[in-house]
Amino acid sequence: MDAMPEYSLFLVRILEELDTKYSTVSYQDLCKSLCARFDLVHLAKLRSLLFYTACLDPAFPATLFKDKMRCSVEDQQSKKLMVAADIVTMFNLIQMNGGMAKDKLPMGPRPKFHKNQSFESCRSDTDVYKYNDNDRAYKLLDTRGHHVSRNSPKSDCNSCQQFIPTSDPNFLLGVTKDLKCRAASLDKLQHLPQYASVSPPPCEMQSTYFPMDIDSESTTDQESLHANPGIKDVYVSSGEPFTVHSCVQKRNIFKEDFHNLVAFSPHVITTECRANPKSGGNYHHRRELSKPPTFFNHSFELPYSNPYFEPVNSPLQNKGRVKHESLDDLQASTYFGPTTVSECVSNRRTSSKHGRQPAWPVKSLSLNTEEGPDFERSFLNGKVPKDNHRHNIGTMENDQHFQCAKDKPTASPSGFSKKSNGSKTKDMSSVACGPGIEKREVGRRYKDKSINCPSFQSSNVDNGMSVGTQTEQHESRKVKDYPSQNKFKERPPFKHSEEDSEIVSDNISDIFRFLDDMSVCESLGVVQPSCYNSNGSLSQVTKSDGDSSPERNTIKIGKTGIKLDRLFQSLENSDDELKESVCKLVLRIGEIEKKLESLSGVRGEISQVLSKLTRLDEKIQEPEVNGKSSDGGLVEQIKTDANLSPHVFQCHTTGHNMKVEKSPEWCCSEADGSESLRVKALKKSVFTRRSSRSLNEENSATESKVASITNSPRDWRTVSYSSHNGEEGKERDRHSEGKERHRKSREAERQYEAHQGHRSSKPPKDSYLVEQVFSPHHFPPTVKTHVKGSPLYTDLRLTGHADGKRSQPSWTIEEYKRNSGDKNKLSALDLQVQESLNPNNLEYWMEDIYTPGYDSLLKRKEAEFRRAKACKIGALIFAAACTVILVIVVPICTMKS
């Protein structure tokens, strides 16, 4: 291992080793190479510097590396390997997400270096001589290609690189095969949040640096700055606007406005690329295709990340920063690092220069290892100022060498596309398509897709990535009219390139309209985002009763939104695109209708069930008419009331006319509630009279009920009634007459059936609703007998008695006395029979529904209970026999003997 006179040069050597090998050597081999060539002391120092530099980025996972720094391993070789692995990992992480740290640090303008220019031209004469004496392997050249001598004038370094503090991450990141930089000190800027801004710490807290001479090691940054007069003269003569004089000034620079500092563009414009940009692009393409998949991920690579600045990109010269660019920094920041939007902004400004080579594309930050066209570049090229259309021509000319990867089948960016229902959706790059070839390529890619998937699923859209693509779509359309497309005549002309581009743009508009609608609907609490696609239409309804939910209204809103969007688009588009849009709209409506057909079957089933329930009410009333003449008039009255009831309303679930007399759990409206509840109460009072019948009659009624269900051919949907407002007065009279007649007949029968009159003949609406709510029955009658007798369900048995004894409130003194007297005469069996025969209770309709496993479980528990009971009885008998024998027989025998 070569001995180096400077730590800074030594670290440059290590970083050069990393940069030259990480694209061609695997991760394990790179770690082994570092362990074999460098000492643990230097590796540990570099690891510490990399860690503190990476900590400037808030997206850096510092906790993963912090514990390892404190770890003390006995084996030096394993410790060396661990440190080398951390260096390689952090080096690539910093290369990927170093943009945040670059934005936060104060920087001055730096001139660009070409590939054939050495970093040593900025070195002082003394250092150059030292270096030449120790290591003859490096040829030190100045900017004009001459050898550097001791007596070189200071003006030779005027165009050299300025002073860069090693706290700058560019010092650690910017070293590539051909570009190297040096520094005089290494400040630990991570100590910033630990001290108050009023009383800064002494400079000794920042004494981690690389001295110019190992023998004369200075202790402060001040000494390191002034250790060599040649270096000082270089800084003074260069006219550097930002010169560090003390730690206090270095602290205070962070309180100033960073936006007024000069920005930079992280790419290298070499002499070869400047002379022939196309060849430079081909070189970059060959480099990218030759990258092996063995090392981490290709997303870690930022080729030619340059620490030097371009003064043409200063925000002082261009104040037109968009407000949401700072928001893009936050939205694009992920666990693996931000997407360096500030670099994209500077690239966007420099791309307007005619004939200038654009920036190297930023890699995709996805974890996908496949190569593909750059999403970031297409995103930032999609926003073009209105007054810069002439500059787009040069951008399109220089973009062509990035397109050769798109013609290969392996170049599809699978990180930005998904599959759903067997058909591929549109590429994510179509959301943020830029001008030029990319837009035409995206249009062709869109045209190749099947027409069966015209909508772009909203789950594939990232709101942060789509910023700024909608507002400039008209300007991006105009770009294709320029004659710069003659550059691409080697490709066959597209037949529908214009219409395809507009289709893609319209789809972008649909996405943004969908997002706006979603924000409005979410504030209202109506729409569930997973049910809707980008056109605002229903993608899938998972509920069978979707029509009764608030989504029914949003379906209509979505359909009308589709029609309005298509109508507005048809005013702008050509006839061919209008036809295509109409075809897609018809197909989409057909898909929606097919999805809604499944709901129509559910509607039919519900309507049939309700019609059979209505017929069941009528069938149950027939035995009462034939059996008891005293109830005949009342039943007839109820039937006439039911047939002539004017209260018909539109059912929310089925969309058909429906009587209110059905159970109000299905449909209950405020306007029709009072009349229907009266009729329902009259029906209930009739059903309570059947409690004195035997269980055989109940079984026969059940059989007749089942027969009526199976034999009723009439569809409920064919039943319709007309509403007449003039009959309301007559119906009220009928109700009052029915109540009086029912009260008289009940008074006559009270002496024979005293326990039957416990229910009031005037049930008000409130009490009826209270009974419906507070009298739930969870088990059918076939199971309730087991439940009431089982010791495992004592709580249910108690609540069953409580529910059975709860009756309607009494509104007069007579009813109160009568009900209080009748309650004591009721038995549990009568209550159970009454509840099972009451159609207002759930168990009336759940009578024949049971679970065989539940019955077998109850039978098993009952058998165990009986067995335990028999064992107890046997034990008691045995104990009694033993007691008798011991107490009576034994004394008698002893007395006789």
From Swiss-Prot:
* Name of the protein described by the UniProt record: Major intrinsically disordered Notch2-binding receptor 1
Which segments sit on the Extracellular face?
A: 894-897
Primary site of residence: membrane
Similarity-based family? Belongs to the MINAR family.
Which parts of the sequence lie on the Cytoplasmic side of the lipid bilayer? 1-872
Record-linked Pfam families = MINAR1_C, MINAR1_N
Indicate whether Transmembrane appears among the record's keywords. yes
**Bias (Polar residues):** 411-423, 452-471, 697-724
Q: Where are its TM segments located?
A: 873-893
